[in-house]
Amino acid sequence: MTSAKVLYFSGEIPQGDPEGDQRTLFRKLHLLSKERDHVVLASLLECVTLTLKDECSKLSPQYRDLLPPFESVLDLTDHVVQLRKTPLGGAIERVLVLVFQLGSLVAYHEAHPLEYNFTPASTVIIGRGSGLLSAAAIGLSPSIVMVPSIAKEIARISFRFGLVVDKVCRSLEVSSDEINSDGAWVYCVHGIGEKEARDAVNQFNEIKAYPSTNGASVFNVDDAGNSVSIGGPPKTLEALFSESNIFKKTKNVAMRKIQGMWHTDRVYGPEHVEQIVPKIESARELHVPLISPVSGDPFRETEAGPLLEQIMEEILMERVRWDMIIETVSKQLKQLMPKSVQLVSIQPSHYNQNMLERWKSELPDAAVSGLTMMPAILELALEQSPPKDTRSSKIAVVGMSCRFPGSDTTEEFWERLMLGEDMHRHIPPDRFDVETHVDPTGKRHNTSKTSYGCFVDNPGLFDAMFFGMSPREAEQTDPMQRLALVTAYEALEKAGYVDGRGVIHRKRVGTFYGQASDDYREVNSGQEVGTYFIPGGCRAFGPGRINYFLNFWGPSFSVDTACSSSLAAIQAACSSLWSGDIDMAITGGMNILSNSDVYAGLSQGHFLSPTGGCKTWDEGADGYCRSDGVGSVVLKRLEDAEADNDNILAVVLSAATSHSAEAVSITHPHDAAQALLYNQIVRRAGIDPLEVGYVEMHGTGTQAGDPTEMRSVTSVFAPPHIQGSRPIPLHVGSVKANMGHGEAAAGIMAFVKTMLVFQNGIIPPHIGVKTGLNPALPDLDKAGVVIPFRAANWRPTGTKKRLAMVNNFGAAGGNTAMIIEEAKARPRLCEDIREAHAITISAKTAVSLSLNIKRLVEYIESAQDLSLADVAYTVSARRRHYEYRKSVVVRSLAEAIKHLQPHIETAKSQTPTLVKRPPVAFAFAGQGTFYVGIAAQIYRDSPFFRAQIDQFDNLARRQNFPSFLPAINKTCAHEDLPASSIHLAIVCVEVALARMCMTFGIKPCAVIGHSLGEYAALAVAEVLSDSDTVFLVGTRATILESNCSPYTHGMISVRASVDDISREADGLPFEVSCINGPNETVIGGTVENLEAVADRLSKVGYRKTRLDVPHAYHTAQMDNVVNELIRQSQGIAYNTPKIPIMSPRDSSVIETGANIDSSYLPTSLKKAVDFAGALNAAWEAGVVSKSTVWLELSHHPVCSGFINRTLPNTSLTCSTLHRDSDNWTSLLKTLSSLYEVGLNIDWNEYHRPFEHALRLVSAPTYAWNNKDYWIQYRGDWNLTKGQVLPEAELPAVSGFRTSSIHRLYSENYDSSTAHLLGECNMTDLSLKGVIEGHAMNGYGVASSFLHAEMAFTLARRIQEKASLSTFTGMGINVTNFEYHDPVVKDASSLDPYPIVVDAEANLEMGEVQIKWFNPAIEKWYCHAIAYYEDPSTWLSNWSRTTRLVTSRIDALVAMSNKGMANKLTTSLAYTLFGKLVDYSSMYHTMQWVILNEDEAVAEVVFPADTQGDWAVPPHFIDGVVSLSGFILNGGTHFDNVNNFFITPSWKSMRFAKPLAPGGRYLTYVRMIPEGVDDKGRLGSYVGDVYILQDGEIVGVVEAILFRQWPRIMLNRFFQPVGMAPPAPRVEKKRDAGRGTLPSSSSLQEKTTATAVTAKITARFPGSVITPSRSAPISKSGSSPKIVPQLDYSLLTPRTSPNSDERIEKTDSDSGFEEADGANDVTSRAVEILAEELAVDKGLLTDECEIADIGVDSLMSLVISQKLREDLGIEVRDAFYLEVTTIGDLKKLLS
């Protein structure tokens, strides 16, 4: 007997609400189709969807416009009711019936694949109406996988079937709306037979005289023959049942859900079949009988095409005889006589029950049952298999971090929410000045009407060194981008992300961040545009920098959709995960407010509340309150997160973004667009919207936005037609009421809040309603919507997961929303039975290490229900590790606290581990300390270790050795173990331990084995294969047992050297077996001999220990064993070692690649083990060193002591196992020690055997060593930009202009002080001759004497204007003059080159402080002090010196006359001077020079015209003073061929009488050495210059200093600003094809005279622009031009000099004062590096890694250019790729 199946497909859609019953099933089918076990279902839905879209594309426009957009055919379920009112209603319904039936059947049989066993002999298929099409699909599909392909064609037929029926029916009766709007086209009539019904219908049609097409017809007879179905136009049927006496008596039901009528040949014919059924190429045939509902017989056609045509003919034109179908099926069942009959149907129906009852009565011996697909599908469990593809995955949120107002952590953020805090406050001063930038009236230009916002505290705080950024780069990088980097890192820490761990690869990780403003770039860093202005401020660099720092290769997107930017970024991240582009995303948003313009613009646009915070849903809502915010979350596909053992905070089911395209304005919300979006994400998520329990609303607090959003939310999640029947209340909230509107960060704020709501099971109180609810909101009570004014519980209940929606809108019209589901709790699948755990903590600095320890201790102390194993797993396996480290091995949390607390302080002084990880040498012990149960616990718990051991044991047994597992798992006593088992256990355990350690990241640099341990060493060095190792060890042991009598010989370990033992043995026989250390020796021999030697040794006090071994290894007892072992091991192949092997046999090192003789191991059994000799040989060969870490792989530490005593400088020696300790604890202590010395332990591998028992805990994130990097917005230029302001161009003081001071910015006097600020334009025509006539290196130079003239000029101006009687007749002494960074002019440039001169006088002291500022290099470069003194006093003092000076002059003249000194003419003197200075004729004032080595006198005659308006003409000063320079640069006594000499300073310059035009003077000077440089060379010379007129000293320049410099430095000192220096003489090799850097002159902003004020004001904002008291009216007739009155304190150097150092000396100008830069290139290069990075030079040690201090590609460009310019050396622009540390850079430069 067999089993029979009857498959029944009705033509009905599910009964009840089509948006209820259908939607429930279709949601289930949608969710099932995402799973890997339901790929056929997914294929079916896809095929039908594609077919439907294809058919719809062929419709006329008026029909196409009736269809809503849809992603899947299932989406149309939401539109069934609306579509019924259109001509497409029937077509869509027919397709949905097909999907409903085939989808249910396919889904069920994918879950129960064995039940799809429909055989022709025992299966029959029946169907009604359009159900015949579904029946045909199954009949034509022998396999379930074949269903989708035929369903594609049948879906086309179904759709066309509906269209044709609608078209035909509308031709019979006009209907402008739903085809059934005027009545039903079909009635079901009970209590009447077919004949009676047909006669009555025919009679009625004749009486009414309808056209034949419009009459009624009987088309269906039920199985009992007493019910019929009658079809016809609604008006015809209405008349029939109201007028016919026969039908008035019957019970009839109008079938309003059936769209039109068919089964009548009065209106349908073959032409309609042709329109519906396409030509089908498929050659499929029925594989089971399909019964015709017309004839009751199987369809005559069996091939797909003809069969479908026949089916369509019967559906359209033939009457249904259901009674005949049932009769045929019953007859076949009776003939088959099955043991069971199963009726398989799609949905419950009275037909099902009728059939089952009949068969039960007719087949009493058969088990008759029914299987209904619909309830069976609804009962199928979800998530029983992984997603079928990435598109079907859920997205897990696994980590998050934030910087929100008042909240630096998510915990603080939650606390603020639960306390109901409103974080709005006045704009803090670090953003901009509220007093000037806020005007509540809005009348003032560019001001905001509101002063409120919600702000992150100290947004500039950042750990630049951690992220490898220089302070300079950090300062110029937008704080929101920095905080995005910080929060991304913290979120990854919370997620437990470690590169290379789990299923995520860094090449498939992307970043997505929302950012909608550029405040910092536009305002803060824009004030001082620098190297990092672009990468620090442009939006793309925000996510790009995260990718770069974390080494992620995936995409990085910066998203701007205005206020929805961050949620849109999260949605983009989800989409990228769903598309399979990436496997992990870091996403979020950022917003830091500092630009007053945005405040002003939003105020003017009426976005902002003038009264404070966001009043969401309040009747007085008046706009939003702006907010800072930066947040990051980490997303993965759910299956990946589960595989990685992540903490899953919540799960994103669906997310989408749309646009309010039909809103009244671009910024206005649109509820229809919002509702459409919600429906879309609900469908994608496959959820019932009524089960959503919480919606985090956008809720900005505006009168337009709040009601619109509430209407759209309630229309979907609490719709009017179900109000009051929601299964759960719908809570709504908005974080903006607490935190303000974060704009680009608003979405991430809402998202993080929702994560916390899920985590804590509480909905925080809503504080936005300050007065009363906005009356424009819908009736929330009626809708079941709850605004929680107090915290509301929302905890998990039952099996259903909580659902929430996060909503976010953008001001530009974008809408983003997502459905979020709570994460299910994952059970621990095993137990972690390890006794101890390592708590590892690391940092990049000692400060952070201390803070990390402190925070972890506080966390452990405060956390509840915390597991030590979880904490250890989190901080070791799930964290990154850095150079500063601490690790403690503990057995409890209390012990962890106890051991960690002391290190909070000690960590502050801890030194980092080496950048280069220490090498590790493996040592393998012999058998001396064997015990049963070695590595038993590791064998039990570690799959890797167990697999290794099992493989070795399998090899041993296959080579006929006994299993050695009993020696490990303690199933045998020690004395019962054969030697082969013991030896194999030892060696195999050691090799397995070594390999396990390698999986932990510990790779050996060399190996050494002691005795038996050499076999393990050679195996690890890959000299021996596993098989050969087992063979050699097993054979060796077997031969030992058979050739040596046990315990006739022995071994004794003695704490003495070989020489000591030999001396004390005094001829007694013994053999040296092992030399383990300098004073550690093992001797062997017969028992008798050993006892005699032992007695001798005991008497002299040597410690000795008898070893528990049965033989005397490495003695003559082994002779026979060695020979036999050599014989039996001839077939063993020794490979060349992959790493060096320290050989105790030969006291040598076997290098990598060396050949090893096959007798090596056999003979080592006889030879002494010189372990110490091997160690020393390795030390001498450099194979090991003091930095080498030693790891002993053994069952008990033996070799460790030998190593420590032989190599006492060894840094660390440790071992894996200890016989008296738990295996895991011993191993862990070793790993902990190795970790602390800098090895990168793979803690994931260590924890892998127990990971299913471990959970990631929310341990504290990294403690940053923050510093504040914030460029303050200075002044109020945001208010005035774009306005035409008066220019500062005219001289400030009427009539005051000299040849050196071209205008005064300001001039102020009071009773005791005076202050002048002036300008000297180096391109002014008045200076042309003076500067170009003093040329050096081919360029005109503003000499020190020109600066002296300016000092005389300003001091005289003050003297004249102060009008103090005490100054009358006073002379001016220019003292303490210092000149750095010479001002060099390019004669070809006509661009203005202004120099600012500042003079500040203390009139009571008679002192003027004068300093010069060069805007081109932004540096104070020169300084002097002028004193008002009595010239008569000078003359009196000088008179005492006159005789001495004149005597020296006379002596020189006499020497010249005798030819003992050189007398030079004017021409010759200036020709010689031309070696350094090319003087023009106006400087040629020396008439003759007498020169004798370091002493000279000259006659100077000045021209009759001063050629300008000067206080003291600079060329006159040069004429009388430059003799000092001529001695050095023009004579032959000093080396001025290779060097040059220039003056940076003098002590004083006084002229008691004016240097008069036409005057004749003598000048005398002697230059003497002034000390030596740091290399013992003469480096500077000093002299006093005397100026005499008519035998009287009238002027003295005291202590004028000249410094000696190599001539190669001329290019450095005398090069115009912005011009590239010529190529150096010797270049280092350059990269071929490397482009050259453009000269900075091409990039430098041209400076105009007017721009000086602007530049200084920009550099030192806060300067008050006020008219000078003497400001004149412009001669041009234009508006008065105001000269700025500057705040002089702001013109001081950034670092105020002390009293002894009045000018700003930087490393770049210290060349005149410091050691010779050309001879100390590397030192100067490091100084340049420190300058450009803005770091302390002390940080730049040789070990400092350049990446850690921020040397990247851009900074590398800057530094390389500076090295060219300042030092004349050539390095690659990308030198940062060639070096790692500062030490490397020094080597490169040297």
From Swiss-Prot:
EC assignment: 2.3.1.-
Region (Disordered): 1621-1648, 1686-1718
Protein name (record): Non-reducing polyketide synthase gsfA
Biotech use: Griseofulvin is a spirocyclic fungal natural product used in treatment of fungal dermatophytes.
All copies of domain Ketosynthase family 3 (KS3), residue ranges: 392-822
Start and end residues of each stretch annotated as C-terminal hotdog fold: 1460-1611
UniProt-recorded Gene Ontology molecular function terms: 3-oxoacyl-[acyl-carrier-protein] synthase activity; fatty acid synthase activity
Keywords: Acyltransferase, Phosphopantetheine, Phosphoprotein, Transferase
